[in-house]
């Protein structure tokens, strides 16, 4: 029995990145061997075991044979005669098909080290096309390693395009699509994930609401990049600069979906695109089974992001209505999330990237002023029932009016 470190741990150590988890392959053993040594079997479909002390995953070397559609249609063969090279051959990318012996020697039959050095994402074999989930994984790796200069090999992109064209992506479950997307949103370059999906034709299949934004123009005065699809990617990149919050990044991705509904004869104007986009956000989130808190923020951002751009000229009553609409009294984190997504929208434009966004701080300060007026003080003054809510609103509007009167007169930007 021989044991090898494989996959991401080897790849990340060679890249000088932190290794967060370790996966091992066991060659020349049976399940009975590992169970007798105290390992705990956890894989139902595949022979995967947990080490009795470290709790690392140890998998018996295996081969896989395509037996049906999608990413679950495989027959697994895990016997002591399966070699390490055979096990590595079934993996997605060459950079993930490098093994390290217990002595520290590398075993690299598919030249993954060379591709690491050259910053190339390349599939190991044509068996790549048997698993449609790998299209999303490559897009995610492209996003994760974009800051290191990684590019997708031409032949790998061609294979991904072929898979998208042949309809294999239709067999992916919503949960798997969202899981990969959620991971991609957490990378330093989430926009790259969606750009790769567009380049291979997968965006139109999995995210048609986003794909439909390409080719839709916006006024050049406010959007020198003109194309709404390009603007959307720029805003996602900006959101990643501003916040690590996946909720913020996803909401930014969806903020302009309503522009895809504007009749061409009305271009490049998109009046009412915010509220119009809410139903598209709902449909996208329902289809991919996006968690409710992420969905709810995305819907609010779609509806109200343009209002934040004009926040400095809003009347106190309108400001309070905005705070009520986003339920900021019970969910105060939404105030910061809305400020950040609106800033990402404003700065996610050609030549606007380094511009200040004073509306964000104005919104934050307005909320601070309004929140200093508490319901407890209203109750203490003897108000009861519905009168508490009405008096609380009146006092908050008054506080906002006093504060607003002290602010410098500014013109809003869009």
From Swiss-Prot:
One of its GO terms (biological process) is tRNA 3'-terminal CCA addition. CTP binds at residues 8, 11, 91, 137, 140. Mg(2+) binds at residues 21, 23. ATP binds at residues 8, 11, 91, 137, 140. Its EC number is 2.7.7.72, 3.1.3.-, 3.1.4.-. Gene3D superfamilies: Beta Polymerase, domain 2, cca-adding enzyme, domain 2. The keyword Nucleotidyltransferase applies. Its cofactor is Mg(2+); Ni(2+). Keywords: ATP-binding, Hydrolase, Magnesium, Metal-binding, Multifunctional enzyme, Nickel, Nucleotide-binding, Nucleotidyltransferase, RNA repair, RNA-binding, Transferase, tRNA processing. It holds the Pfam family PolyA_pol_RNAbd. Magnesium is required for nucleotidyltransferase activity. Nickel for phosphatase activity. GO terms for molecular function: ATP binding; CCA tRNA nucleotidyltransferase activity; cyclic-nucleotide phosphodiesterase activity; magnesium ion binding; phosphatase activity; tRNA binding. It catalyses: a tRNA precursor + 2 CTP + ATP = a tRNA with a 3' CCA end + 3 diphosphate; a tRNA with a 3' CCA end + 2 CTP + ATP = a tRNA with a 3' CCACCA end + 3 diphosphate. InterPro entries: CCA_bact, HD/PDEase_dom, HD_domain, NT_sf, PolA_pol_head_dom, PolyA_RNA-bd, tRNA_CCA-adding_enzyme. Residues 228-329 form the HD domain. Belongs to the tRNA nucleotidyltransferase/poly(A) polymerase family. Bacterial CCA-adding enzyme type 1 subfamily. Monomer. Can also form homodimers and oligomers. Comprises two domains: an N-terminal domain containing the nucleotidyltransferase activity and a C-terminal HD domain associated with both phosphodiesterase and phosphatase activities. A single active site specifically recognizes both ATP and CTP and is responsible for their addition. Catalyzes the addition and repair of the essential 3'-terminal CCA sequence in tRNAs without using a nucleic acid template. Adds these three nucleotides in the order of C, C, and A to the tRNA nucleotide-73, using CTP and ATP as substrates and producing inorganic pyrophosphate. tRNA 3'-terminal CCA addition is required both for tRNA processing and repair. Also involved in tRNA surveillance by mediating tandem CCA addition to generate a CCACCA at the 3' terminus of unstable tRNAs. While stable tRNAs receive only 3'-terminal CCA, unstable tRNAs are marked with CCACCA and rapidly degraded. This is Multifunctional CCA protein. It comes from Pectobacterium atrosepticum (strain SCRI 1043 / ATCC BAA-672). The gene is cca.
């Amino acid at each position: 029995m021989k044991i090898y470190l494989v996959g991401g741990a080897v790849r990340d150590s060679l890249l000088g990145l932190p290794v967060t988890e370790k996966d091992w392959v066991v060659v020349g053993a049976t399940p009975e061997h590992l169970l007798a040594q105290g390992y705990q079997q956890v894989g139902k479909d595949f022979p995967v075991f947990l080490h009795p002390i470290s709790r690392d995953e140890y998998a018996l070397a295996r081969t896989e044979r395509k037996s049906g559609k999608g990413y679950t249609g495989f027959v697994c063969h895990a016997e002591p005669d399966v070699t390490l090279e055979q096990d590595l051959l079934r993996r997605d990318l060459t950079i993930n098909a490098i093994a390290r012996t217990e002595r520290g020697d590398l075993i690299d039959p598919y030249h993954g080290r060379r591709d690491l050095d050259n910053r190339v994402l390349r599939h190991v074999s044509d068996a790549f096309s048997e698993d449609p989930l790998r299209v999303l994984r490559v897009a995610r790796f492209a996003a994760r390693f974009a800051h290191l200069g990684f590019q997708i090999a031409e032949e790998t992109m061609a294979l991904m395009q072929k898979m998208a064209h042949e309809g294999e992506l239709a067999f992916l479950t919503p949960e798997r699509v969202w899981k990969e997307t959620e991971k991609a949103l957490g990378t330093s370059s989430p926009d790259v994930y969606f750009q790769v999906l567009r380049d291979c034709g997968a965006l139109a299949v999995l995210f048609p609401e986003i794909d439909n934004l390409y080719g839709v123009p916006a006024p050049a005065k406010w959007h020198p990049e003109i194309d709404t699809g390009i603007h959307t990617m720029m805003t996602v990149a900006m959101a990643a600069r501003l916040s690590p919050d996946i909720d913020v990044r996803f909401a930014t991705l969806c903020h302009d979906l309503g522009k895809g509904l504007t009749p061409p004869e009305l271009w490049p104007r998109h009046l009412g695109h915010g509220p119009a986009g809410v139903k598209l956000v709902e449909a996208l989130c329902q289809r991919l089974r996006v968690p409710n808190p992420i969905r709810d923020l995305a819907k609010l951002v779609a509806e109200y992001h343009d209002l934040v751009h004009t926040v400095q000229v809003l009347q106190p009553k309108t400001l309070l209505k905005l705070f009520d609409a986003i339920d900021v009294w019970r969910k105060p984190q939404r105030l910061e999330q809305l400020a950040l997504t609106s800033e990402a929208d404003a700065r996610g434009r050609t030549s606007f990237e380094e511009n200040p966004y004073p509306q964000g701080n104005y919104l934050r300060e307005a909320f601070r002023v309004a929140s200093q007026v508490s319901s407890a003080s209203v109750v203490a003054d003897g108000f009861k029932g519905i009168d508490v809510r009405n008096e609380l609103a009146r006092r908050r509007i008054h506080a906002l009016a006093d504060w607003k009167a002290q602010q410098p007169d500014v013109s809003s930007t869009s």
